[in-house]
């Protein structure tokens, strides 16, 4: 099965119900789809009125070993009293298979949206990220990747070169902006950071609030620098971001040491995410869900904006990184 051409069109509701029934779960409600483009995720209630979420993994994105590492990390975090959504085991197995689809079942965890502009909530998140990374430092992922330039920049650049989605009249300017951004990131990238297991996609949308934070969706977990799990929480102008980062770090360091030199990786990581995200959209374009939900990807205005965004981010990389107050 070719990853780029795969769709979930064969994953019918009956297939999902049968997969759950094989594990002794009888669905007593409908299957409510949750917001996920990469995988297929559904919330439901069983006959005992317990609420669960079932997640069907996109084939060939992660291997079984890589998914199991994600599950093992989540279970270790729960054991260390870090609030994450961890998979349910059936006969000792968290990774299940039905008709060629890998899937897992999670308890449904409700909660309010995390308020990124709430300093008290930000402090609590920083504290639990410190605890998460305390667990993350105990060992590294063996099968899951480490954040680096090849996956996030070099491979996407090759994809852009051959892409037919980019309007022909705009492609040269877009590739030039991409090359300038890659050069700027490469000049500021460091390979000497301490590597640990990360959440990997720790933004406000992946944190629920229930008298404290609840971290969800470890699908992008990988090895990398600690700052990767901090920088996406920052918002607002430089002064606001400085205050937020200082709040996070102070709480974080109650449990884990933080290397402030990693702050210099924030803008390189932001640039890498911009490039990687666009490549992800293009790789998934054969899946009907993507043209339906991202129709603007075929428009000239979108590519003009992307080109301008890449040029602007390359300029940002020439500026001094975010500075903390002298006490740090």
From Swiss-Prot:
Q: What is its EC number?
A: 2.7.11.1
- An MF annotation (GO) of this entry: magnesium ion binding
**Which keywords label this protein?**
ATP-binding, Cytoplasm, Kinase, Magnesium, Metal-binding, Nucleotide-binding, Phosphoprotein, Serine/threonine-protein kinase, Stress response, Transferase
Q: Which residues form the active site?
A: 201 (proton acceptor), 217
Residues holding Mg(2+) = 206, 217
Question: What positions are marked as the site ATP?
Answer: 36
Q: Which GO terms describe its cellular component?
A: cytoplasm
UniProt cross-references to Pfam families, sorted A to Z: APH
Catalysed conversion reaction: L-seryl-[protein] + ATP = O-phospho-L-seryl-[protein] + ADP + H(+); L-threonyl-[protein] + ATP = O-phospho-L-threonyl-[protein] + ADP + H(+)
Name the coenzymes or cofactors required. Answer: Mg(2+)
Where does it localize?
Cytoplasm
Quote the InterPro entries the UniProt record gives.
Aminoglycoside_PTrfase (IPR002575), Kinase-like_dom_sf (IPR011009), SrkA/RdoA (IPR032882)
UniProt similarity note: Belongs to the SrkA/RdoA protein kinase family.
Q: Quaternary arrangement and interactors, per the entry?
A: Monomer.
What is the role of the protein in this entry? A protein kinase that phosphorylates Ser and Thr residues. Probably acts to suppress the effects of stress linked to accumulation of reactive oxygen species. Probably involved in the extracytoplasmic stress response.
Full protein name: Stress response kinase A
